[in-house]
Amino acid sequence: MSLLENLQKLIDQTSLEVTDQQKQQLVQLVELLNKWNKAYNLTSVRDPEQMLVKHIMDSIVVSPYLIGERFIDVGTGPGLPGLPLAILNPDKQFVLLDSLGKRLRFIRQALLELGLKNVTAVQSRVEEYQPEHKFDVVLSRAFASLHDMLYWCKHLPHEEGHFLALKGQFPAQEIKELDKEFEFVESISLQVPTLEGERCLVKIKRI
């Protein structure tokens, strides 16, 4: 079975609406990541079939919860979840931020090959990045603890903006230890087809 057919089977198990062109772009992204990974070690996931589940599906299930127009993916690594989400949301603007040059080179190549016009790749440490305009949502997928994410990223959302952290199990202890300037809003349970283990999306705002 081809990657495209496999992706279709996975998407069919969700309520996501994905166009044929977007499916092609998602598969292209996996093929490119697999190719670059052999030389640059961008992800510990080596199998393209597993990349579909652990990287693509795990990212795009967040799509229905993206409210706003401007998003920043902090500590994006090889563009996850930012690139898959940008493919599904061509009307929204994404900044993908990471401090490692090899990751940014991959992202820029992906933007070129996939023809994505709604993504800006930025090489910077998150605490040093000063955007011209604040963001509606700050996204993180593999960025340390909630405390660290909020501490380093608190200058990024505008007053009405919020934080979305993609987590495994519900991080009860981390939420209990939030600083007083932050408020836990909700945790959304995410269903990622064929992925073992829990996934949740934690929403937090500044008070």
From Swiss-Prot:
Its main location: cytoplasm. Transmembrane segments: none annotated. It catalyses: guanosine(527) in 16S rRNA + S-adenosyl-L-methionine = N(7)-methylguanosine(527) in 16S rRNA + S-adenosyl-L-homocysteine. Keywords: Cytoplasm, Methyltransferase, rRNA processing, S-adenosyl-L-methionine, Transferase. S-adenosyl-L-methionine binds at residues 75, 80, 126-127, 141. The keyword Membrane does not apply. The keyword Iron does not apply. It comes from the Bacteria. InterPro entries: rRNA_ssu_MeTfrase_G, SAM-dependent_MTases_sf. GO terms for molecular function: rRNA (guanine-N7-)-methyltransferase activity. Its EC number is 2.1.1.170. GO terms for cellular component: cytosol. Specifically methylates the N7 position of guanine in position 527 of 16S rRNA. NCBIfam families: rsmG_gidB. This is Ribosomal RNA small subunit methyltransferase G. It comes from Psychromonas ingrahamii (strain DSM 17664 / CCUG 51855 / 37).
